[in-house]
Amino acid sequence: MDRKELLSKPVQDLRIDGNTTLSNLMAQFSNIGGFTAAKLYEAHSIISDMFLEDNTTFLSFPADIISTGLRGLINDVVKRKLVDVIITTSGTLDHDIARTFGKYYCGSFNYSDVELREININRLGNVLVPDESYGELIEEKVMEQLEKLYSIKKEWATVDLIKEIGLSINNESSILYNAAKNDIPIFVPGITDGSFGSQLWSFYEQHHDFKINLLEDEHRLSDIIFDAKKTGAIMVGGGISKHHTIWWNQFRDGLDYAVYITTAQEYDGSLSGAKLEEAISWKKVRPNARFVNIYGDATVIMPILMAPFL
């Protein structure tokens, strides 16, 4: 260690007034010293390069955040074509469709779930999802489109099916619609794990020649990976969305840029808790990559991190 180099950047106090913008604040985070704020600045710097360079940018996230107002921010990112590929879960399709045509409500973590069940309200953290805004609504919208798409052809790649259903939504508030309109593919490797997937199963029960070609999705992903000069990923939360993103990037020796936002810890060996450092050993992140792990609630972190780019 070089003492002079280590002591080259003094900690500076924040200066905030009525004229301070998020961009100003982010710039001040570069000299704040501790703790998560410094990581936010590092993430901002990485994402800036990710967006500026000839880079294929992945965005991965779980479904729960789409039940919140963070859906609007994700939608704006998609509208501005800041990312090239989305990898997510079946529940994202559910919540995006449901909130396009119905309403979710602000609630509390502390409500009685037994009582909520009795009055047909589902609780997702502190978000309330009434029955009429979810199951039957999604069934109606998806089944209507499946009938139309089935009349065109019997076999569909999931990524194509999602695009066609997205276009049919024709509503600017919808992530699916704007992704389809802007040719940003949405990959859902666990497509059957949600209401959208249940509609696919139900439709198959009535039409046994209806087929979902998941391997075609993987073929499309392989083309994206092998054609990319560089790749970067903004990963919100873990699970299948994060893993599918880093899994495919191992076939090009790993991501060049990565930002991972999580609340999970690594002590239990879980994928969600695994730091990006661990992914280097699996060749899913390059040893010389620029990356950062940020611990915190995505509904707080993402608006602060992404607002300067919008």
Swiss-Prot record:
E.C. number: 2.5.1.46
Active site residues according to the UniProt entry: K284 (nucleophile)
Reactions listed under catalytic activity: [eIF5A protein]-L-lysine + spermidine = [eIF5A protein]-deoxyhypusine + propane-1,3-diamine
ATP-binding is among the record's keywords: no
Top-rank taxon: Archaea
Entry keyword annotation includes NAD: yes
Cofactor field: NAD(+)
Record protein name field: Probable deoxyhypusine synthase
